[in-house]
Structure formats: C-alpha cells, structure tokens
Regions:
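Transmembrane helical core of 7TM receptor-like proteins
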Residues: 1-316
C-alpha cells in the first residue's frame, strides 16, 4: 500500500534525530560500534553455520533455534550500521522508503524473538515432559509448521501494522528518534485519524506478549514439575541446562524492552540517554545471545570445538 501525501510540500527526504556525540569521541564511538556489530555478525554467523553443517545439531530444537540468530542479525543490521554512518558523517537525512523498511524490519525482529522463544519453549516441553513421544510429535512436518507459524504470524501482523500507517496522509518530515519505527512514522501524518492505528498497535503488542509469555510460562512450569518429580539428578541438570539459555534470553529481552519504554515516560531523563535505551533493545540481545547459547548449550559448545578440530586437522 502506497502512502498518501496531503500536498506537494511533503519531501521524501526526512530529517532524523541526531545522536549527539562530542566531536572528539566520534571516531572512538564509530570504532567501538563497528567492533560490536562485527562481533555480533561473526558470533551469530557461527551459530547459524554450526546448525547448518554439524550433524550433531540436526535436531528439532536447533532447527527452531536457527531462527533466533537469524532474527538477531536482522535486528542489529537494520539499526547499527546506518546509525554509525550517520554519527561519523554528521548526517541526519533518511529517505521515506528506507525509513519504512527499517521500521518494518525492527518491528519484525522484536516480534520474531517473542514467537521463536515460545516455539523453543514448546519444543523443550515436549522433549522433557513427553520424552517417549518426542520424535513422533516433533516430526519434520511439525517443526517446519512451528517455524512457519512463528515467522508467518509475525510478518502478517507487521504488514497490517505498516499498511495502516501507510494509508495516512503525510506532511511532516521530522523523525523524533534515531531510528524509524511505527510510532515515528505515525508522527509524520497530519489530519488523519490514527485511532485505529493506536488500537491495533496496543492489541498487537498485547497479543504477542500474551501468546509468548503464556506458552513459555506453561512450558517451563511443566518442565519444573517434571524436574522436581524426577529421581535422577543427571536428568534434572540436563533439563535445567537446556532451558537456562532460553530463560536468560527472554528475561533480558523483556527487561531491556521495559527499560527502553519507561525511559520515554520520564521527562527528567536526558534525550541521549533515552536514545541509548531505545538502541539497546536492538543491540543487547544480538550481541549476548551467541555467548549465552554457547555457554549454556552443551551441544553447541561440543559442535563448535569439533568444528575447530576438523579445521585444525585440515591445515596440518
């Protein structure tokens, strides 16, 4: 759906809020930001490559988990490179189609994390609470359906969100954040009724949270009950280790998200601090997730060291 414009004065070139960095700190910030981005790309890329190439990871859990580093790459790549370029070039111009694309991808990332974590929790519930039926339930068809449902639902919901935004006439050209999102794009409109947009946005956020949290709470509650009732300590330890990474990731995502939202509700917080909180939502998890999964998932650690050994033998 193409955006409507109220008059000929609307420019496709938008002014986006600047992230203030002292002149003497511009290049250090750019250098550190680039290292953070490259670290995230490298680590998430390694996780993706391991799942694709290591037969020990060709299991339903890791096929579903494949979507998590993929989403992390979408999130951080949609935000950090452009922000770093703007900082070093002192530019604050963004074109409307690029702005819409960035906003869509950032919203897609946030939704995909919630749905993928719910899918992983469901897989762990079946594996730990119904181990004898695991392979009969988590067939390739079921795994593919779970992955398609997670991404398909997210994409469909975000398409509707941005289609509702695109129908509004535009006349303003200032983006009040350092990145584009649905709310920033809504503020470009003039004269249009955004009631439907606000209602849908609230319903969308609530739906995603309720679905994701409900599935995870149910799954991990059942897993906890199974662990408590299980007599073998090794089985308990394995169950806890296999779920800890997902719980850490979900907790971090919710804490950072809530912190970022609350930062805009208090007027005494400096604008730059608010912008940092917003940026953290799309950078913290993409950087930390590979570390979290590498430390807490034994199969990934073993696959990584096995791949290193193969490479070492290949060059000797």
């Amino acid at each position: 759906m193409e955006a409507q414009f109220s008059n000929d004065t609307f420019s496709w070139s938008l002014q986006i809020a600047k992230f203030y960095v002292p002149p003497e700190a511009v290049y250090p910030v750019f250098f550190i930001g680039t290292l953070i981005y490259l670290f995230s790309v490298l680590c998430n890329g390694i996780i993706l490559a391991l799942i694709l190439t290591q037969r020990s990871l060709h299991k339903p859990m890791f096929y579903i988990m494949f979507s998590l580093p993929l989403a992390d790459l979408v999130g951080i790549s949609s935000l950090l490179p452009r922000l770093l370029i703007d900082i070093v070039t002192l530019s604050n111009v963004v074109y409307y189609p690029t702005c819409v694309l960035q906003g869509f991808l950032l919203h897609l990332y946030a939704g995909s994390v919630l749905f993928v974590l719910a899918a992983i929790a469901f897989d762990r519930y079946i594996a730990i609470c119904k181990p004898l039926r695991y392979h009969s339930i988590m067939t390739p068809f079921t795994v593919g359906g779970v992955i398609a449902l997670a991404w398909g639902t997210d994409i469909a919901l975000e398409v509707v969100l941005f289609a509702l935004q695109a129908r509004l006439p535009k006349c303003k050209t200032l983006i009040f954040n350092v990145y584009c999102d649905n709310m920033s794009l809504l503020k470009l409109s003039c004269g249009g009724d955004i009631t439907v947009n606000n209602i849908y946005g609230l319903v969308l956020t609530g739906f995603m949270q309720v679905v994701s949290v409900s599935i995870q709470v149910f799954s991990y509650t059942q897993i906890l009950k199974t662990c408590i009732s299980h007599s073998q300590s090794d089985a308990r330890k394995k169950a806890v280790n296999t779920c800890s990474a997902q719980l850490i990731t979900f907790s971090l995502f919710e804490i950072v998200g809530i912190f970022g939202i609350l930062s805009y509700r208090f007027q005494n917080i400096p604008p730059n601090a608010q912008k940092v909180c917003g940026i953290m939502i799309f950078t913290i998890l993409p950087v930390l997730n590979p570390i979290i999964y590498g430390m807490n998932t034994r199969d990934i650690r073993n696959a990584f060291f096995m791949a290193l050994k193969k490479q070492r033998f290949a060059f000797t």
